[in-house]
Amino acid sequence: MLSTLPDLHRSFAEQLKLKFQSDSRIHSLLAGGSIIHGGFDQYSDLDFIVVVDPGYYDEVMAQRRELAGTLGHLLHAFTGEHVGEPRLLICLYGPELLHVDLKFVTLEMLTQRVEEPAVLFTRDNTALERQRVKSSAHWPNMTPEWFESRTWIWLHYAVVKLGRGELFEALGMLSFFREQVLG
């Protein structure tokens, strides 16, 4: 699977895998996003799910920025509260820029997932598979009624921004509308 990635991505992913395999606190390393969905290219980011032994979860969460710093030349990292996912660490590595998402979970947390990740390594495949079969991936899709009740307010908001001459805000709202409503 990793062999099909562009050189920069493959090299980073292989290094990350080796690093986490040597850390006894890490139970498994899973890959998601375009690695499993296809369409991966030189501009893609890397999406990883780091399954941590529950006895070390708090420790790893407290040290995750430092841990990310050991994986390469970390330029910056921040957590994913803005997307409703505080377990996510969004990282930018350089000097050749590479965006890497590291989501830290325990085995028990795998029951809530939006995709079926690929296993890059695991210390206990039986435990991992037992947890994965407890539930299936579920994308939190909203009903058409949910979107309909918001559509005109969102479009009005964009029109108001345009009327004020706030062009970037209007473009941002239209982009949001395209992503959330039109898909």
Segment roles from a protein language model:
Residues 37-43:
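Short glycine-biased active-site loop of nucleotidyltransferases that positions the nucleotide triphosphate
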